[in-house]
UniProtKB/Swiss-Prot annotation:
ATP binds at G8, L9, S10, G11, S12, G13, K14, S15. It comes from the Bacteria. One of its GO terms (molecular function) is GTP binding. It comes from Deinococcus geothermalis (strain DSM 11300 / CIP 105573 / AG-3a). It holds the Pfam family PapZ_C. Keywords: ATP-binding, GTP-binding, Nucleotide-binding. This is Nucleotide-binding protein Dgeo_0723. Belongs to the RapZ-like family. Disulfide bonds: none annotated.
Length: 280
């Protein structure tokens, strides 16, 4: 797994790149002088950390004299060393700074700072394996590009959980779906004590074409919503399916969705209220 040095101009998206790598399982160290890259490698190796990313930029300007030597020493030990450099036009950097009202680390007028920073970081840019111009990129597009350029797999997980509305919806769901319009096995005496995990209960829930059509529309909407979340750079999406008590209908729907949406990494994480025993 790569050891990644993230650098670039202030306002070019380094924080977004670091968050992306952290979400991809990297151990992140921000604002690390080049002289400490080797020590970070040793520490990570001792702790069994396979994915490591550090950032070095204008904030460490007093230590950049050791840049080339530090790079050469680490590259001999890490064949997978990668340097990622981000940049953008001065006009875009200025606009981003005006939006955030942050002070540039070099502390002069912004346009002068940008010019000085480009000169200061030129040796780092020259070492870069990957240079990304973020001028026209959104944060989500930058995240995707970072993963693509580093050839990292972006794992996405669609989490499905069932619940009963009488016990309140979960607070951490991205999407809540109400399936109380489906046929209710609670009113069938022989099905009442059973759960939506059982074929007989699921067969009753999806017993007619209207129920099948309802399910297909739910499935397609969940696919659309989760797909949009993944395209936006998210690594997970949680869908909560609710019926009255959380024992029958919501369980059956969650299980069927998990089987139908495996391409989105779908899995049932919890049947929260299935054992409460109030049915519905």
């Amino acid at each position: 797994m790569p050891f990644v040095v993230v650098s670039g101009l202030s306002g070019s998206g380094k924080s977004t790149a670091l968050r992306t790598l952290e979400d991809a399982g990297f151990f992140i160290t921000d604002n690390l002088p080049p002289e400490l890259w080797g020590a970070m490698h040793d520490l990570a190796t001792a702790r069994g950390l396979e994915r490591v990313a550090v950032s070095t930029d204008a904030r460490t300007r007093f230590f950049l004299g050791a840049l080339e030597d530090s790079y050469l020493r680490l590259s001999r030990r890490r064949e997978d060393l990668r340097v990622l450099f981000l940049e953008a036009t001065s006009e875009v950097l200025l606009r981003r700074y005006n939006l955030t009202r942050r002070e540039h680390p070099l502390g002069e007028t912004l346009l002068v700072d940008f010019a000085r920073e480009r000169e200061l970081l030129a040796p780092l840019r020259a070492l870069a394996d990957i240079v990304i111009d973020t001028t026209d990129l959104t944060a989500a597009e930058l995240s995707q590009k970072v993963l693509q350029m580093l050839r990292l797999e972006q794992d996405f997980h669609l989490r499905l959980l069932s619940f009963g509305f009488k016990h309140a919806p979960p607070r951490d769901a991205d999407l809540v779906i109400d399936v109380r319009s489906l046929p209710n096995p609670y009113y069938v005496p022989e099905l009442r004590p059973r759960t939506g995990l059982e074929p007989a209960v699921a067969g009753y829930v999806f017993r007619d074409e209207a129920s099948e059509q309802f399910y297909r529309e739910v499935r397609d909407f969940v696919r659309l919503a989760a797909g949009r979340a993944r395209a936006a750079g998210r690594h997970g999406y949680t869908v909560a399916i609710g019926c009255t008590g959380g024992q029958h209908r919501s369980v059956a729907v969650a299980e069927r969705l998990a089987a139908d949406l495996t391409d989105l990494g779908a899995q049932v994480t919890d049947h929260r209220d299935m054992q409460v025993g109030e049915g519905g």
